[in-house]
Swiss-Prot record:
PROSITE patterns: EPSP_SYNTHASE_1, EPSP_SYNTHASE_2. HAMAP family: EPSP_synth. 3-phosphoshikimate binds at residues 20-21, 25, 163-165, 191, 304, 331. Its EC number is 2.5.1.19. This is 3-phosphoshikimate 1-carboxyvinyltransferase. It comes from Methanocorpusculum labreanum (strain ATCC 43576 / DSM 4855 / Z). The active site is at residue 304. NCBIfam families: aroA. GO terms for biological process: amino acid biosynthetic process; aromatic amino acid family biosynthetic process; chorismate biosynthetic process. Catalyzes the transfer of the enolpyruvyl moiety of phosphoenolpyruvate (PEP) to the 5-hydroxyl of shikimate-3-phosphate (S3P) to produce enolpyruvyl shikimate-3-phosphate and inorganic phosphate. It is an enzyme of class 2 (transferase).
Length: 422
């Protein structure tokens, strides 16, 4: 299904969608904790549902209620019945965190995903699990693969600059071993706030993580406790709403905890740097249109913001440089290339660099036919760009936003955006 976007002004109020990152972690930790945990206001998007389906297959008892998921955990197991495969669909978070958990289970677990996921790098994590003693089979360092455990613990070495999800997968699974686990990072850690989010979630469930000189230490003998978790709003998804307002109106977004450890909360200070009107009042953020000025933005710790910040930069006076996001080339698409392609097709003065892009604005954007490559963040960023384009923009895959923000189009329509699916 395509999305047709026409030039629009937006205004109004909307509640931020639930956090995808927090929902993944809540489902996984609840499944590892003995007893009953309730996850309140979770995001039920395609990625998080892949995680929920996987923990059910591995033995968690899941009950879906009204805006809540109740999970009876503590009994995950392998091997699974013959022929059962954990299909993580398009979710890199699911497959990477679950692979770590599978290495601690007594048996073999088989993983796969869709074509996009099966092209994304897994080798650093698979090598790390092998170093810990897991049996690993994979043809090319990507999915599909099998993991055979259990591993006890020990020292493990892994790059920190490919995906923070690798580190989170090792951390979450570490308490399940009989020995301490020391994770040594062989390169600097990118997207560190996501690892901090994992550590914070583990702490809420009773497990502590220590920082060592080159990584992390998780001591054995710790047990996850069952806890009820309220999932807060998602700054990554709210960024698209913020940018739409900064370019085409004024809106208020509620449900965003200022104390939340999400790294993408930095989007608010980025908007201020560009000159957008920003007012914060507790969990409410109001953004209004203003004349934007160019800025240099380091996205090493908030790479998911890249596509929408590039859209903002295209409308800022002067030359902006977005950098520090080389690992975006291994997302659902090569997200740097995908962003540059759609903005250039709309008339932006933008060029690709190894770890980001250079954008000179403001550009008069024109409608175009946008290829998303099945990437939800490209879909939403291009839809926002379409709000200020001189003619109609056609986005080739309206449905891919269901990965992280299923209600995106409806929320934008509620705010007055001229968007329709056909």
């Amino acid at each position: 299904m395509k999305l047709i976007v026409s030039r629009s002004q937006i205004s109004g109020c909307v509640h931020a969608p639930p956090s995808k990152s927090h929902t993944h972690r809540a489902f996984l930790l609840a499944s590892l904790a003995k007893g009953e945990s309730v996850v309140l206001s979770p995001l039920l998007g395609e990625d998080t549902l892949a995680t929920l389906s996987a923990v059910k297959a591995l033995g968690a008892n899941v009950c879906e209620g009204d805006d809540r998921i109740t999970i009876q955990g503590g009994n995950l197991h392998a091997p699974l019945p013959k022929g059962t495969v954990i299909n993580c669909k398009n979710s890199g978070t699911s497959i990477r965190m679950l692979a770590g958990i599978a290495s601690r289970l007594d048996g073999t677990t088989e993983f796969t995903g869709d074509a996009s996921l099966c092209s994304r790098p897994m080798k650093p994590l698979l090598d790390a699990l092998s170093e810990l003693g897991a049996g690993v089979t994979s043809d090319n360092g990507c999915a599909p693969f099998t993991i055979t455990g259990p591993v006890s613990g020990g020292d493990v070495h892994i790059r920190g600059d490919v995906s923070s999800q690798f580190i989170s997968g090792l951390l979450i699974s570490a308490p399940l071993g009989k020995a301490d686990t020391r994770i040594h990072l062989t390169t600097p850690l990118t997207s560190k706030p996501y690892v901090d989010m994992t550590i914070s979630a583990m702490k809420k469930h009773g497990v502590s993580v220590e920082t060592i000189e080159d990584g992390y230490l998780v001591r054995s003998g710790q047990v996850y406790s069952s806890e009820d978790v309220q999932v807060g709003g998602d700054y990554s998804s709210a960024a698209f709403l913020f940018a739409a307002a900064a370019l085409a109106g004024e809106i208020a977004v509620s449900g965003l905890d200022p104390a939340d450890p999400q790294g993408d909360q930095v989007v608010i200070s980025i908007l201020e740097t560009f000159g957008a009107g920003v007012v914060r009042d507790g969990e409410n953020v109001t953004i209004r249109k203003a004349a934007l000025k160019a800025a240099d933005i380091d996205l090493a710790n908030a790479p998911d913001l890249f596509p929408i910040i590039a859209v903002l930069a295209s409308q800022a006076k002067g030359t902006s440089r977005l950098y520090g996001a080389a690992h975006l080339r291994f997302k659902e698409s090569d997200r740097i290339m995908s962003t540059v392609l759609f903005l250039r097709s709309m008339g932006a003065d933008i060029s690709e660099t190894e770890d980001g892009c250079i954008v000179t604005g403001p550009a008069n954007l024109s409608g175009a036919n946008v290829t998303t490559f099945g990437d939800h963040r490209i879909m939403m960023a291009s839809a926002v760009a379409g709000l200020i384009a001189d003619s109609t923009t056609t986005v080739d895959d309206a449905g891919c936003c269901a990965v992280s923000y299923p209600g995106f189009v409806k929320d934008m329509q509620k705010l007055g955006a001229d968007m329709r699916e056909e």
